[in-house]
Amino acid sequence: MSRIGIFCFFIIASMGAPFAVAADMLVDDVPIPADARVEVPLEVSETLSRFSGAWVGSWGDRLHHILIVEDISASGEAHVVYAVGNNGVKGVWRRLEATVSGNALTIDDTFNATYVLTPADSLRATYRRGDAVGQATLSRIALTELMLPGAHVAWATPSEFLDTRLQEGGKPIRLEVVIKKPSGSGPFPLLVFNHGSTGRGTDSNLFTATYASPQIADFFVEKGWIVAFPQRRGRGKSDGLYDEGFAPDRAQGYSCDSGRSLPGADRALDDIKEAVDALRQRSDVAAGRILIGGISRGGVLAIAYAGMHPEQVLGVLNFVGGWMGEGCSTAAEINGALFQRGGKFGRPTLWLYGQHDRYYSIEHSRSNFDVFKKAGGNGEFFEYAVPGGIGHALLAYPNLWSGDVERYLTVIGALRAQ
């Protein structure tokens, strides 16, 4: 079962019984109870009252989700309707109890779902079970809109497409990109944040999932940045073949052979160059150097890209970066070769890693950092104890890394005067 499939199984199974399986009302593919209601909260704080109402979004870009906060007390006790659908599972809803503390609503029971209010009046949701971590950003919607017959919802931010100079089979390639930005016309400073791999590369169903990080988007948009999440060739809705270092038999997934793996990284770097060049031409993007970052494979690509194109880059955010996991005996060779390319960047970079990462141990990642510094690289390395011992999920915990990122932005002069 794929990681997305496992995650969806967990999030449905954890709802337990009893739950509704017959849709009282259907919003696209998500059932909600016909008697859903929202009671106007009385004599509660402004923060508590902001949770009240209906919210819509998607777990992992695939599992549609509706949360209805039906009532909330002055002490933070709430009753919610939790509903999901899509991704090949039968839509379900259930009424659950929840608790609000500060700006976070946590569903009680054993559900492991938390919703954090953002300054943009959205909910940043995180679901955790074992090493499965799901993320979603939920937008507010009037319950009356959901209750209309035949109601439909815009579940995710619409994608845009970048024209590139890439071609395959004589046909031009367009790359999908998710854009998050502040209100207004800008221009805004640009962060390009790059996605990782698909686990072992053996499940083609994962190739078409569009990646965007609500944590990164919320953090930077609040600070006045436009954030772009480009999808490389064959990923998400981008054109072309996903071909980042596969074995000769693609069913075997990513190859540990450096002769196949490193050309795959070069292909990914070509895609990033095309995306960056196209994004810098936008009227809402400020002239000048950009920030570049990424998670996992996207992290090492960001470091390498900065070394290859230092004239474009102001700073680099590397979250748990690496190209091949330590399950490959060639991991040190492959990862070291890519991080070494970043040494020519010269400016400060930020390396953020979680302890007990099942792909990249702290020892391995610090060794990569040493290789980078010996090649002339400049940076700081931080490690964090991620809850549950799932270090590769560090990005889902902005409470751990946001302070270090803000300090880094101050150091490189990337924070605009407030």
Where are these regions (language model features)?
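Central antiparallel beta-sheet cores of small beta-barrel/beta-sandwich binding domains
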Residues: 24-146
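Short substrate-entry loop that stabilizes the transition state in hydrolases
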Residues: 186-188, 196-239, 325-326, 358
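Primarily recognizes the serine-hydrolase "nucleophile elbow" in alpha/beta-hydrolase
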Residues: 270-341
